[in-house]
Every structure is written in structure tokens, then in C-alpha cells.
């Protein structure tokens, strides 16, 4: 069974539109990257451009590293960082809810009202959501 899973992973391909959705950019951007040779593509029997799963994975890692170039490194053990913009802050008497739009991802964090006030968090501010969890569930799409 393990060999079948590995074989399937090797055979996984994505259309330009699927790759764009996964990378959080427009299909035109992915086409330009492909035309410039930044992402290898092949064509299926109908002429549709396809991107290999391993090529897309490698490019997404390189793209993330490129986006973080020149930024100060945070001294933290949380490695899953999502830079974005604060889109909502809901304050309660004790707790608060902060929403961040990080590319195509909407992240919601519950924290204390005191922490929100100390950090001066407000709608429109740039922020980084850092995620550290003992359990992360991954489902196949």
C-alpha cells in the first residue's frame, strides 16, 4: 500500500488554476511564472498546462522564503507564521477575538482583552499570526 501512495504522489499534477488557488495568486501570475521558467510545466493530451505536485511544492517553499527575505527573524519556537492584515477585533469584558487575513487564509485567534490592548491591535494593522499546536489535522482535498 505504501508503494501505491508514493506512486500516486509522484503522479499528482495541478492545472494552472489549481496551482494559483494553492499559492494564493491569480492564474495569470502562475502563467507568467511558467512562461518565465520559474515553475516547470508540461502539457496533457489536450494541450492543457500541468504542474507536477513535487514541482509545485518546491516552488511554494521557495516563494515563501522569497517573501520573507530581509525580514527580521522572530525569536520564537512557533514556525508556522502567517503575515497578514487585521480585519476584525472584537473585544469582550475579558476575552477578545482577532481576525487576520493572510493571503487566502483567514485566521481567528482568541486572546485576552489585556493582550490586545497591550499590543495596540486594531483593524488595518499589519500583523503576523504564529501557530504552534500539539495536534494539527490535515485532510485530503
PLM features: residue spans?
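Short, Lys/Arg- and Gly-enriched loop/turn segments at beta-strand edges
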Residues: 95-98, 132-141
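Major-groove DNA-recognition helix of helix-turn-helix-type DNA-binding domains
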Residues: 23-48
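Beta-strand/loop nucleic-acid-binding surfaces
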Residues: 106-119
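Short helix-start
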Residues: 40-62
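Short boundary/loop segments of OB/S1/cold-shock single-stranded nucleic-acid-binding domains
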Residues: 59-78
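Short, conserved beta-turn/loop elements at beta-strand boundaries and strand-helix junctions
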Residues: 89-95
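Conserved hydrophobic positions within beta-strands
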Residues: 84-86
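Polyanion-binding surface elements
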Residues: 7-25
Amino acid at each position: 500500500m505504501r508503494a501505491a501512495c508514493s506512486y500516486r504522489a509522484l503522479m499528482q499534477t495541478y492545472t494552472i488554476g489549481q496551482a494559483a488557488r494553492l499559492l494564493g495568486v491569480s492564474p495569470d501570475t502562475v502563467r507568467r511564472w511558467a512562461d518565465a521558467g520559474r515553475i516547470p510545466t508540461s502539457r496533457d493530451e489536450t494541450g492543457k498546462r500541468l504542474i507536477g505536485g513535487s514541482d509545485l511544492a518546491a516552488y511554494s517553499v521557495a516563494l515563501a522564503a522569497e517573501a520573507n527575505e530581509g525580514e527580521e527573524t522572530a525569536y520564537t519556537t512557533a514556525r508556522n507564521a502567517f503575515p497578514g492584515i487585521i480585519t476584525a477585533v472584537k473585544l469582550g469584558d475579558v476575552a477578545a477575538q482577532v481576525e487576520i487575513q493572510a493571503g487566502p487564509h483567514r485566521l481567528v485567534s482568541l486572546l485576552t482583552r489585556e493582550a490586545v490592548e497591550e499590543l495596540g491591535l486594531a483593524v488595518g494593522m499589519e500583523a503576523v499570526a504564529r501557530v504552534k499546536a500539539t495536534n494539527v489535522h490535515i485532510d485530503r482535498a
